[in-house]
């Protein structure tokens, strides 16, 4: 059990049978009345973020989240298949489970998959991805205004904003957490 008074960023707990992650918290001690903990937490299954205040003595079951490194194998049109690096077990995941990560994952790359009570619920791509630009408008010579970007489609199908000097065929480094261009590779 974990009490609301022990909440810190990154603490996991169960609320209404759902795994939750503390995103932000603030211990509030008003001049009058009882202290409370203002908490912003994310439901790890649905991705919904909520804000709620709790009594510091309120207790919640600790959510045990298992994390495994798994290799992305392929997509059969409906499901995305991942293989456990240790026991070579393959698991199929649907689009809702891989939605955010699959934009930056190439086949055979390793991703982090989180499990709750033995069921996979979240896929996380590596923090940085090096991807080839497959489609973008050509840069126009003389267009040198600072911080001007254009849309570029990378090999996984994701669309990212890149500087004007990036052309089709260039490899770019992308921060997968924000989807932002970092550099040319």
Curated annotation (Swiss-Prot):
GO molecular function, one term: translation elongation factor activity
Disulfide bonding pattern of the chain: none
Main localization, broad class: cytoplasm
Alphabetically ordered keywords of this record: Cytoplasm, Elongation factor, Protein biosynthesis
Subcellular location: Cytoplasm
Coiled coil: none
Cited CDD domains: S1_EF-P_repeat_1, S1_EF-P_repeat_2
Gene3D superfamilies in alphabetical order: 2.30.30.30, Nucleic acid-binding proteins (2.40.50.140)
Pathway info: Protein biosynthesis; polypeptide chain elongation
Record bears the keyword NAD: no
GO biological-process terms attached to the record: peptide biosynthetic process
One GO CC term on file: cytoplasm
SMART domains to which the protein is assigned, alphabetical: EFP, Elong-fact-P_C
Keyword Cytoplasm: yes
Family: Belongs to the elongation factor P family.
Purpose of the protein: Involved in peptide bond synthesis. Stimulates efficient translation and peptide-bond synthesis on native or reconstituted 70S ribosomes in vitro. Probably functions indirectly by altering the affinity of the ribosome for aminoacyl-tRNA, thus increasing their reactivity as acceptors for peptidyl transferase.
Name the record gives this protein: Elongation factor P
Taxonomic lineage from the root: Bacteria, Bacillati, Bacillota, Clostridia, Peptostreptococcales
């Amino acid at each position: 059990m974990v009490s609301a008074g022990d909440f810190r960023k990154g603490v996991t707990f169960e609320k209404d049978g759902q795994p939750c992650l503390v995103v932000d918290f603030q211990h509030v001690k008003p001049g009058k009345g009882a202290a409370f903990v203002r908490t912003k937490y994310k439901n790890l299954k649905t991705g919904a973020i909520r804000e709620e205040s709790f009594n510091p003595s309120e207790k919640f079951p600790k959510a045990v989240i298992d994390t495994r490194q798994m290799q992305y194998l392929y997509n059969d049109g409906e499901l995305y298949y991942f293989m456990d690096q240790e026991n070579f077990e393959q698991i199929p995941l649907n689009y809702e489970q891989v939605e955010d990560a699959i934009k930056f994952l190439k086949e055979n790359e390793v991703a982090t998959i989180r499990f709750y009570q033995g069921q996979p619920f979240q896929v996380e791509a590596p923090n940085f991805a090096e991807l080839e630009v497959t489609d973008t408008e050509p840069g126009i010579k003389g267009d040198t205004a600072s911080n001007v970007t254009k849309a570029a489609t990378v090999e996984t199908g994701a669309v990212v904003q890149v500087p004007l000097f990036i052309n089709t065929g260039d490899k770019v480094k992308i921060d997968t957490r924000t989807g932002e261009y970092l550099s040319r590779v």
